[in-house]
A protein has these predicted regions:
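Helix-loop-helix
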Residues: 1-57, 96, 194-197, 206-229, ...
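Short, Gly/Pro- and small/polar-rich lid/capping loops
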Residues: 49-82
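Soluble non-transmembrane domains of integral membrane proteins
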Residues: 77-345
Length: 645
């Protein structure tokens, strides 16, 4: 990039900034727009509130009418006292409420439940409560002739109760029942079947579907609200394969799903609640995500309204499976073995591993190495060992890249001598050709160091996607870091500062300092190998390279300590490798080797091949085109002069 390019980019930036500033609304216009927006939101909220109130009133009126009629369906089931039934194993504990007959509390064992009000972790709980009480709601709705049956209104009677199973039954009339049977497996999967008995004549003729309304307020489980919120999504799996999620933002999202789906998940960063339908959920399921305010203890409020198959004769049960557990890739993948539906559920896709090539690296390399090392070493040591392993794998490419730069460095005096005559701006093409010819004499490819660096990029991006989703880092301590899965603040305050937030992360600062050091070393190395005007232009580019660590600080201050620590260690080792290579490279010996190669090429000239040959051919073509343009311009000028005479 030459001086004119830099000036051009700066002018474009100034024009864009100036245009944006000129076209921004005035303070009065902003206030007016804010007032109009507030009025519109208030009206919408009022209409929505009125609609919900009307629906609640209609339901209450219908319920009151049924309660007043002792002959109505489920008359006895509309009154009662709520009881708790607990199903548990070594992995999870689920509390069912006989009012509604569904799970009202899910506790995941073996994972630290953070007390977010105590920052030092001294009051953390030994287990994670995924939801409790009013956080979650699940109701099934059936269209009967007399009135709609809504399970959340009914009091069920538990029977056949064990630690892993229970049957909930609500009596519609003598000999007519609605039952829900739950069976808990050995891991995180809960099987449920809903079935009627003796109620075939009570339903509408076209009643072969049931409606499901499932909602949940996703709890904030981690100390970093913004970071956890980013990974908290309503995700669903299409019956034909593949997952998708709502594109949540700062506003409420309503979306109709046009495909048939077989499961829907309310996913936190590290834990999920999943509902699977054996006969799939029909098209046009309606999904909602509402963001919650920071400090409320919640991240988002999810709701899924769906329909699935229902047999009113009672011959076939409607079957569902629930997963309440961690977003651990291997656990999610192995959970399918507990499913009785025979589907390829692909739960493991809840763990985001990056774009296709990045996902492939994480899926078949990082995951296995990480799991293997984590069985032996603490997580902090695992990150260091993974860094060392990756550096060992990429070392041959790094060395090749460095040696290419070193060769150009020792050839710098010869390049300056060979290009000394090309000092004018119009001579830049000839100068480039002379440089390439000089490199070819010594068998040096100026771009041979680029490909190894490009090959390393997917590895760096793979770790960027893997570490924030690695539940193994959650709650793990290392050195001064109390939890590798969230930021490690050295200073915190109550107000939110633009770009920074409400804290300073120590590992982020270390990463940025290491980045600054590494940038200085690489810039110095590149400057030492550049000739003439290129070296001067590189000095102008330094400030851009030095701004990168500052940009990274604003980007990564909210990221997990584990990720920042990995980048810090990676850059530290990269700087150490570069320093070692510089100290162990003898410029005189390297130049002697190149001189020997030059003499061999001189005595046995070979045709240039590969990248150098293509670049030389391209430069020659450009030179010929430039020469032809100059000739035509000279002819045109001569004609103008003749006409002037």
């Amino acid at each position: 990039m030459n001086k004119n390019n830099i000036i051009g980019f700066l002018l474009i930036a100034v024009v864009l900034i100036g245009f944006s500033w000129y076209n921004q609304p005035s303070a009065e216009e902003q206030r007016a727009a804010f007032v109009q927006d507030s009025i519109a939101k208030a009206k919408h909220a009022e209409m929505e509130k009125a609609s919900k109130a009307a629906a609640v009133k209609r339901q209450a009126d219908a319920k009151a009418q049924i309660e007043a009629d002792s002959t109505a369906l489920f008359y006895s089931a509309l009154k009662g006292q709520a009881q708790k039934v607990v199903l548990k194993n070594e992995k999870v504990e689920l509390t069912l409420n006989t009012k509604g007959g569904t799970v009202e509390k899910a506790v995941i064992k073996g994972y630290v439940g953070h007390n977010l009000k105590v920052k030092d972790g001294s009051a953390d709980q030994k287990d994670v409560t995924l939801f409790d009480g009013n956080d979650q709601s699940l109701k099934f709705m059936l269209e009967a002739k007399e009135a709609n049956i809504i399970t959340s209104d009914l009091y069920f009677t538990p029977s056949n109760v064990t630690d892993k199973s229970v049957t909930m039954t609500a009596e519609a009339a003598p000999g007519k029942t609605l039952s829900m049977t739950y069976t808990l497996g050995d891991d995180y999967m809960l099987h449920m079947s809903l079935q009627t008995e003796g109620m075939a004549g009570l339903f509408s003729p076209n009643c072969n579907k049931m409606s499901i309304d499932w909602s949940d307020k996703a709890r904030q489980q981690e100390r970093g609200f913004m970071f956890e919120n980013r990974y908290t999504t309503l995700t669903y799996h299409e019956a034909e394969g593949g997952t998708d999620h709502l594109n949540e933002g700062s506003e409420k999202i309503d979306e109709k799903i046009e495909e048939t789906i077989d499961w829907v998940s309310f996913k936190n960063q590290f834990f999920s609640a999943i509902m699977v339908a054996k006969d799939n959920f029909d098209k046009d399921a309606f999904m909602t995500s509402i963001p919650q305010e920071k400090g409320s203890g919640y991240l988002k409020q999810f709701q899924a309204k769906m329909k699935t198959a229902f047999d009113p004769t009672g011959k076939k049960a409607s079957e569902f499976e629930f997963y309440f557990g961690p977003n651990d890739f291997q656990i999610l993948k192995n959970t399918e073995k507990e499913s009785t539906f025979g589907k390829d559920l692909e739960f493991q896709k809840l763990v985001y591993l990056g774009w296709p090539i990045i996902r492939w690296i994480n899926r078949f390399f990082t995951l296995y190495v990480f799991d293997w090392l984590s069985n032996v070493f603490p997580m902090g040591i695992v990150l260091i060992l993974i860094t060392l392993l990756l550096k060992l794998i990429t070392y041959p490419m790094v060395k090749k890249s460095y040696m290419s730069s070193a060769k150009m460095r020792v050839l710098k005096p010869k390049l300056e001598a060979a290009t000394a005559q090309y000092n004018k701006p119009e001579d830049q093409m000839q100068k480039q050709q002379a440089m390439m010819a000089e490199y070819a004499k010594y068998g040096v490819s100026p771009l041979s160091g680029c490909l190894p660096m490009l090959i390393q990029m997917p590895v760096w991006v793979a770790m960027f996607n893997f570490v924030p989703n690695a539940i193994q880092l959650r709650g793990e301590k290392f050195l001064w870091m109390s939890d590798l899965s969230t930021f490690d603040p050295i200073f915190e305050w109550n107000t939110n500062i633009w770009l920074i937030g409400d804290h300073l992360s120590l590992t982020c600062i270390l990463f940025c300092v290491a980045n600054l050091l590494y940038s200085w070393m690489t810039m110095r190395q590149q400057r030492d190998q550049m000739v003439g005007q290129q070296a001067e232009q590189m000095k102008m580019m330094q400030w851009m390279m030095y701004l990168m660590p500052l940009m990274f600080f604003f980007m990564f201050n909210d990221y997990s300590a584990g990720l920042n620590f990995y980048y810090f260690i990676s850059l530290f080792f990269s700087a150490a490798i570069m320093w070692t290579l510089r100290k162990t490279t003898n410029d005189e010996k390297l130049l002697a080797i190149l001189e020997k190669r030059y003499q061999e090429n001189k005595n046995n000239p070979k045709k240039a091949s590969g990248l150098i040959a293509r670049m030389q051919a391209l430069q020659e073509l450009q030179r010929q085109q430039q020469k032809e343009m100059m000739r035509k311009q000279a002819e045109l000028n001569e004609k103008k002069n003749n006409l002037g005479k």
